[in-house]
Amino acid sequence: MAGSPYVITYEGAFPLPSSPDEVWMVLQHLERFESWWGWLTEFRVDGPGLQAGSVLRGTVVPPLPYRIRVQIELLECVRPERIDAAVHGDLDGRAQLLLDPDGDGTRARVSSSIEVRQRPLRAAARLAPGLLRWGHDRVVESTVSTFRTHLRDGDER
């Protein structure tokens, strides 16, 4: 998969204003995800929540004219340190979230390697290789910004 125009490999680190325990408490509110993030629709959880074996299903709508249907299978969830996941659907690959203590806050590290499986998006990846990366990065920026707001507002309660 490496070097393929269909693969988006990502690594990012973000400071968050709350401890790893507080971050985890907010992450557990899966029922709020669709209302938090305008790019997420048709969201549902099959399973007990933020635990291994659960599957998060939804549609991602980046600021481009396409939609991506995904199923995120939680492979391992170690509170409040790590989530490992397999991504399936219009994308296929792996993703990981690490939560490291950083003073009074948290350093969230995200890594993923996902292959675009949807035919129209594969064609777009060949014609405009940076387009999918741009859409991906806008979704990540929006997610982090909104999540910081919910942490500051005390949405863990």
Where are these regions (language model features)?
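Hydrophobic ligand-binding cavity/cleft-lining segments
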Residues: M1-Q51, T146, D155-R157
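Residue-level detector of alpha-helix boundaries and kinks
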Residues: I8, S18, T59, D84, ...
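Hydrophobic/aromatic beta-strand elements that line small-molecule binding cavities or substrate pockets
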Residues: G12-F14, V45, R69-E76, R94-P101, ...
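Short loop segments at secondary-structure junctions
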Residues: P17-P20, V78, D102-D104
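Glycine-rich portal/gate segments that line the openings of hydrophobic small-molecule binding cavities
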Residues: R44-L91, R107, S142-R157
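Beta-strand/loop substructures that line and gate deep hydrophobic ligand-binding cavities in soluble
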Residues: A86-E141
